[in-house]
């Protein structure tokens, strides 16, 4: 599944928990991205890493963020698919509302629009949009589109 997705993609953003084992998983995923870019999808690039479940008060979170930043700075000027990548400025803070929302079949923007989690994802959307469209500014409020629980086709089945 991962390889098929990477073969179809042009750009990848990776969510990363700031933990040691997640860094190991990132290493394995970078190997897979390198393999796909070298064999079947030369257009594939890693645009950034988003730190999730981030707790700024922990030393580990800061160390992982520095390690990721250092890794990407060392890759500048290489031919790696992540040579222009970055650790995104927006960090998705640990927030119970993010964990609760899916159990209600809703996005965090629907379930808890005033929560830290919703705020963080709005900021992330603005940051990613600014990377692709530096001359455009998104409105401060991102509209919430309600999740559709089913379609006429699925109801008829």
PLM ranges: what are they?
Residues 94-102:
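Short, glycine-rich, amphipathic interfacial segments at transmembrane boundaries or analogous
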Residues 123-135:
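C-terminal alpha-helix
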């Amino acid at each position: 599944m991962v390889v098929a997705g990477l073969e179809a993609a042009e750009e990848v953003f990776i969510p990363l928990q700031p933990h040691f084992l997640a860094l190991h998983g990132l290493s394995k995923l970078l190997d897979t991205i390198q393999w796909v870019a070298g064999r079947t999808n030369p257009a594939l690039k890693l645009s950034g890493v988003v730190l999730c479940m981030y707790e700024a008060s922990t030393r580990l979170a800061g160390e992982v963020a520095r390690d990721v930043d250092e890794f990407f700075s060392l890759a500048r000027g290489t031919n790696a698919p992540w040579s222009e990548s970055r650790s995104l400025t927006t960090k998705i803070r640990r927030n119970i509302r993010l964990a609760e929302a899916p159990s209600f079949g809703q996005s965090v923007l629907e379930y808890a629009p005033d929560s830290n989690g919703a705020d963080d994802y709005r900021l992330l959307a603005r940051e990613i949009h600014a990377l692709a469209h530096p001359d455009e500014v998104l409105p401060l409020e991102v509209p919430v589109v309600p999740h559709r629980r089913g379609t006429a086709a699925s109801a008829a089945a």
